[in-house]
Regions:
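Helix-breaking motifs and short loop linkers at transmembrane-helix boundaries and internal kinks
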Residues: 53, 85, 106-112, 140
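Membrane-interface helix termini in secondary transporters
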Residues: 47, 75-79, 83, 168
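Helix-loop-helix hairpin linking two adjacent transmembrane segments in secondary transporters
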Residues: 151, 155-194
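Extracytoplasmic gate region of multi-pass secondary transporters
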Residues: 41-42, 231-288
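Cytoplasmic helix-loop-helix junction between adjacent transmembrane helices
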Residues: 116-153
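Extracytoplasmic
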Residues: 22-56, 254-259
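Cytosolic juxtamembrane N-terminal segment immediately preceding the first transmembrane helix
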Residues: 1-36
């Protein structure tokens, strides 16, 4: 009976044939690297201030430029996923932040670091939305909620990993070595390019668009009109946007400055500070 039901449901059958487990493996790893790369600034901020003689305003601007780049990357990544493909954007975004963050280890000025960091964060922001979109389309419905929840732990695990690595690398080898390690995710980008296909749903939608056919479920020309025309949808969109913005403001604001504050203002040794941050990220990971 079960096999007959699957055979009668082409979309379910197609979803099960897609290598979603392999896709999850790669998406989890690239999100781990994403979380680690976002967190790397917090643990190198004190070293950057010392080497380049930065003021608190300049140091804070590094975090602001990073978040600005991620915001633009998130918006652009959503559009690019629909136009160019989910896997393709993940590959490009991973390669972008990996290469540019890696070259940040060679910078000789504050301005060079800001420029590389901003462009790298375009990739970091795009990656978050692209991995979620890909897995939403590839994973069978009965596993989707669990898989997406597990996927999100990769981001927090990345923060935990960079905390542990920082405690070992920075006191001995310096902050530049930590950035050089971010060249490693380029290997994931190359592997995904050859091993993970685009989801079947995107291929079909793309084929329809290229052939000029109209889908009865096609989105309206202006998708934002569907949100703002309906008062209930409009209110929900505004409230969720505000709550999400405030949440990210608090999270990244604390994450960027807390390590530096613990080390410089409270006089906590770097390794002890890293241990404290590791406990914070570990708690977050289990909460997810």
């Amino acid at each position: 009976m079960k096999s007959a039901a699957i055979a009668s449901n082409p979309s379910l059958n197609a979803a099960q044939k897609q290598p979603w487990k392999l896709a999850f493996f790669f998406c989890f790893l690239v999100l781990l690297c994403d979380g680690a790369d976002i967190g790397i600034l917090a643990f190198t901020l004190s070293s950057l201030k010392e080497e380049f003689g930065l003021t608190n305003v300049q140091a804070g601007a590094l975090g602001s430029w990073s978040l600005f780049g991620m915001a633009i990357g998130g918006v652009f990544g959503g559009w690019a996923c629909d136009r160019f493909g989910r896997v393709r954007i993940i590959v490009i975004a991973t390669a972008m932040f990996s290469i540019l963050s890696g070259f940040s280890g060679f910078v000789q000025s504050y301005e060079q670091f800001v420029a590389l960091r901003f462009v790298a964060c375009l990739g970091l922001g795009s990656l978050y939305i692209a991995t979620n979109t890909l897995m939403s389309e590839m994973v069978p419905t009965k596993h989707r909620t669990t898989v997406l929840a597990a996927l999100m732990t990769g981001f927090t695990l990345g923060s935990l990993v960079i905390t542990s690595i920082s405690a070992w690398i920075i006191p001995v080898y310096g902050w530049r070595t930590l950035y050089l390690l971010t060249f490693i995710p380029i290997l994931l980008s190359i592997s995904m390019y050859f091993l993970i296909p685009e989801p079947q749903s995107w291929k079909e939608a793309r084929a329809l668009k290229l052939s000029g056919l109209k889908n009865s479920l096609e989105k309206p020309e202006n998708p934002y009109k569907a949100i703002f025309d309906n008062p209930k949808h409009r209110l929900m969109f505004i409230l969720w946007s505000m709550s999400s913005g405030l949440l990210l403001f608090g999270y990244f604001g604390v994450s960027n400055w807390l390590p530096s504050y613990l080390e410089t203002e409270l006089g906590i040794k770097f390794k002890e500070m890293a241990l404290y941050m590791a406990g914070t990220y570990l708690t977050m990971m289990f909460a997810k």
